[in-house]
Amino acid sequence: MAKKYNEDYDIRIAPEFSGQDSNLRTTSKSQKYFLIFLVAVGIYSGFQTATQYFASELQYSPYLGNAMFYIGDVPIYFPFKILTSWGDIIKAYPNLSEETYSIGYCGSAPFLIIALLIKFFTSNKLSGNRFLHGSARWANRKDIERMALIPHKLTFEDKVYNLMPWHKKKIKEIKPEGVFVGAWQDPKTGEVKYLRHNGPEHILCVAPTRSGKGVGLVNPTMLTWMYSFVATDLKGELCALTGGWNKECANKYYIRFEPAKKRQCIDEAKGLYNVARWNPLEEIRAEGSTEYCYDHKTDSLKKRICDGTKETADTQNIVTQIVDPKGEGLKDHWAKTAYELLVGCVVHLKHNCPEKCNIATLSLMLAGQIDTAKIREKYMASQNGDTSSIDDESDDSDTMDVKNLWEDMAKGLDREGKPYKARDAAIIAGQHMKDRPNEEAGSVLSTATSFLSLYTDPIIAENTSCSDFRIKQIMNSDKPVALYLVTEPTDKDRLSPLVKLFISLVLTLCASDMEFEKGRSVKSYKNKMLLMLDEFPSLGKVEKMQESLAFIAGYGMKAYLITQDMAQLFDKYGKDESISSNCHVNIFYAPLKTETAQIMSDKAGTTTILEENKSISGGGLKASTSRSMQATGRALITKDECMQLAAPVKDNLGNIQKPGEMLIFTAGQPAIHGIQPLYFQNPLLLKRAQIECPAATDIILKNGRLISEIEEEEKQKNIDKNPFEI
């Protein structure tokens, strides 16, 4: 029969390995040093005992020479004098010399016997490489401190260092901050520590539905994160629990972008509404448009007029997401030609009807409901002072033959009748539509309009008609921005293209314009940003996310991606996905699928344990037993043990009463066997969550200008009107 020695393996308690000892069960370095010490003490004790005995028998004769020191009136001699200077004296007393040596042996014997026994019992055990089959282990406190998930505890040496007056730079215990990745209970003290990650690296959390990831990771993070963030929020629960604290206490702009919710006025005098608007086409850096950027030299925002060099690129990026929301590429002729047409139409609309340039207007223009040529005529007439030709606004929507649109696009003129930099896209698209046969042109047009069907919903059309904020303002505002991207479960699939468009533009626009000074990159943003994307794979394949994770950290963006299962991630991105490999920290709750459990076990690795084999031969009094021990490999945590990780304990109403277990993997470090943190068990976090969510969303921009800039101008006008008023 076989018996496995599992003292070094326990899923609950981390084994304390030094990480430097390469022997499995042989004598350690400390044991070797102790054996050497025992032998040395034994030799010293034997010679000292023999020397003192010989001297006492000669009544400490003066002929013995000087003593090392005295204990009372008793002289203590150098222990090895019986081998050196006392040699002639010992020869004169042969009987006494035998007794002296016998006494010396007795003085050494106890220490040498102890050393031999220790050596016997340790050498009787298996020797070899301690990590023969694997070196996996659970992380201890020092490992977790090295991962920077808990603050470094000041050691005695650190405290002594701080007391020295000539050390001007003191060692400080870092205050914990960052996103929550779990909690850990110290097996020595029983103390529970929150694990918080504040580095630029990304995080992937794998947790089934109703497993406690919201109350354990998402809510605590949103109630402590002091910088900007974009959070996907299904049903608006996250917004309700964390929006109040972020606006009232964290001093952030509170923005609730819920495309499918009816816009209602909250405060007419202040122009406040329940949801914010966002127009994707206003993100295009068109020629003459305004952009607000961060100036690292002055640590402030600066206003910049765009020169139009990035207009075509921005338009193509937006149209790509509209035409190919699944990220599968433009596979057929109709999709490719529709893409070309939409790029040209957006550029044309941007320069001929900039005040109404949105996707709903774009679909109306393609339906022949907007005559851009007439708009140009009226605008040019108004600029020349001819007001007689200006009709009601309803005339802007007069129907027109769509063929006239292709003619107008092919001219490449803006509403002032002048050519513009990005006109090539409009000219080419218009000319190609003119040259196509009617049937083909009709098919291209119908394909293009089919991609815009989402924006025929009047609620979505209103909420995307203009922008109360721009994406770059999330990281480049005078204070951080808390942006909640809210979708109802019934609208999740329908709104998926718009949500993916928003996220893709965040990754595109916020990861640009890196500057360098003295051979190093400098910060190109005012506030760093967290992307908290819950149920990330349910959005569909966001190819831009998979491509961007490798470099967006350098632009101040940190992604926190949450999925229910690894199979869900594989379904959207394939087995060779690069999302998990670009996430420095991987968090796992108890899985429901064996595929995910196997991944967890593989990540934890293999450890080396001892296996004892015992065989019995014979019987009765003649029975004999032989034992042998060998090293064998074992998964640090097996697949079935992963699936049996303790789940949260819930009451009959489904409320969590006791946290469950979790595994945290950090690149290059041992795995952490942790417990789930619960925000409502922390009085401070619970108090923050009880702050009422604002009814109205904040507005950062109005007509493309910062609200703060407009208010400052109005304030200055009032001062100029009343120069003597205090």
Sequence positions of predicted segments:
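Basic- and hydrophobic-enriched, low-structure N-terminal and domain-boundary segments
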Residues: A2-S211, V215-V218, Q264-K270, P280-I284, ...
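Short alpha-helix boundary/capping motifs
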Residues: D21-S22, Y77-L83, N476, S580, ...
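Short, exposed beta-strand "edge-strand" segments with a Pro/Gly-rich flavor and a Y/T-containing core
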Residues: R25-T26, F121, L126-E157, V275-A276, ...
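P-loop NTPase motor domains
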Residues: G46, T51-S56, T122, Q185-K188, ...
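Glycine-centered flexibility motif
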Residues: P165, G182-W184, N279, C353, ...
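Conserved ATP-driven motor cores of ASCE-family P-loop NTPases powering translocation/secretion/packaging/pilus
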Residues: L549-F551, Y555-L663
